[in-house]
Amino acid sequence: MGRTRTKKTKQVKPTTAPSSTSSAPEPSIEALFDKAQELLIQCNYDLAHRFVQRILERDSTNAEAREMSAVIDLERGEVENARQIFLSLVPPSSTAPNPPPHSAYLYLAQLSDGPHEALGHYKAAVDLVVNRVNTGATMSEDDKSELKKTAAKALVAMIEIWMSDLCMEPEAESQCDSLLALAHSTDAGNAEVLQAEASIRMSQSRPEDAQRSVSAAWTTWRDLPPGDPKIPDGETRLQLAKLMLELGLNADALEIIAGVVSEDDQDVEAWYLEGWCLWGMAERVKAGEKLEGGNDEKGKEKQEASDDDLGWEELARDARDCLETCKMLHIGQEHADKPMLVHVEELLAQLDTLGIKPSSEQGDENDGEEWVDDEDDVEMS
């Protein structure tokens, strides 16, 4: 009988309680804020809120954290909670910092129940921003530029209120003109301000002045390379394209819309405007009209090429392709703008009446045709 092997027991090292000096340090408020901001960008609102709450547990007066908490509430649909937090950040609240954040006023303007209340909040924001620019001796030029853009955007929002909700007020026109002058002096050459100017001039039945403003707005970013931060966002560019369509500058509008589509091919409104623009061009070419391409040399050259290259049927077919894409995306995304879908279907019905088929169907028909070789054709003749 062999020797039995003794079982070896594994030695277990005694555990000692970690000393207080080896525990991980508490993250700084700045680190917590950066993490909350990162989560907010990722749309992880619940986790972002937890990080903000950790900041407020350590510093309940932290204005940035309170504002971010309100922004998170907005994203989660808790609008009234957000409103109350924003109100706590501005006078006459006893918990408002000095000076209050201009961004809180901008949010309150968008959450306002009436136009006059919104105007008051926008004005407060503009006053704060302009004061910061004028007194910020040590502020960098980039920071000043961003603040000027913020003030100009708020002034444009005020102009839009006077042109829509308060358009029947006797002082509406004078208010628009004074706000426009202030916007120009605050941020000269701002594209959105120039677009607002074009809208005002159109409402005043001054189309030539409106066209000059539209051209000036486009000039501010037209030749910039794609992705340049100075190029306005897609929504602003589509607003400019709409103004161009109202002025009959379809070719220029088409160039702007195509740029937006190339950046975001899921943008329902961009496809709608591109289809509508092309359909308008098709109608005018069919009627024997020359299309307007702007007053500069680029516009004239581009328009001459467009007139030579495309007949009305080709333009109409391109319009149909865009409108079909718009309809598909509108339904797929459950887009909120129902009148847009109604108009798209009306335009498609008109194209049906004219016998304009989508490019895919037209291509299928061409594939079924019998091709005749040029040499055979010559021999037969």
Annotated model-derived regions:
Residues 208-358:
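Structured C-terminal portions of repeat-based eukaryotic scaffold domains
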Residues 95-110, 117-174, 280, 284-326:
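Short coil/linker segments at helix-helix boundaries
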Residues 27-54, 75, 156-168, 246:
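Alpha-helical segment of the N-proximal tetratricopeptide repeat
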Residues 27-33, 98-116, 146-167, 188-199, ...:
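Amphipathic alpha-helical repeat scaffolds of TPR domains
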Residues 20-22, 59, 88-101, 128-151, ...:
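Flexible helix-coil transition and linker loops at the boundaries of alpha-helical arrays
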Residues 50-53, 87, 123-130, 181, ...:
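Alpha-solenoid helical repeat scaffolds
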Residues 348-381:
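Acidic, serine/threonine-rich intrinsically disordered low-complexity regions
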